[in-house]
């Protein structure tokens, strides 16, 4: 066989195989996204404890072998679904911050509005972020606390960089921002447990009170 033909055949054999116009990597990515979506749906409607690999695969329309192609176990899926949805929430908040007026009240209101709107409009996301992520394992607990710390750092960074509020007189500012994030989450949990009885505007005002109180405390206690 001529060398040129051998070379062409070898190059062809090394190229990604395609099926119905998609490469193997593309199909794996599609299955991965299907499983993430199915995981959110099943966990959001049934709870993590009841979310079996079989039920997630049934929701995704895939066999179990494809589940283990992407995830080692249910907990690994939970972690990826959680990280995906925290990014989704953070992106919604950042977009709101970008559009808000550059003052402390408007900035806080915009972020809180985006946060509570997202939970209200996406009950599966709310159940995952507020309840189902808790108490699963030490590894998942660490993931949860890391995410909460990231939100606290985000708010502090944006607040300071835009000079929206000055709480420099408080000895441990990190504690304050972490506390604000935790308090807003608890408001959200209570709201969800009452089946979102209060209107979004009312819940936003409750959260805004906490941020205003932190700012006012510093203003009133600065020499």
Language-model regions, residue ranges each:
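Alpha-helical DNA-contacting segments of helix-turn-helix folds
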Residues: 26-30, 71, 76-85, 92, ...
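N-terminal intrinsically disordered/low-complexity leader segments
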Residues: 1-30, 166, 219-223
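Amphipathic alpha-helical segments used for helix-helix packing
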Residues: 121-139, 156-159, 189
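Helix-turn-helix
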Residues: 42-76, 80
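Amphipathic alpha-helical packing segments from all-alpha helical-bundle domains
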Residues: 87, 91, 138-164, 174-186, ...
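Short, amphipathic alpha-helix enriched in basic
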Residues: 22, 28-55
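Hydrophobic alpha-helical connector segments
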Residues: 80, 95-121
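Hydrophobic/aromatic-rich alpha-helical bundle segments in the mid-to-C-terminal region
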Residues: 130, 162-210, 218-223
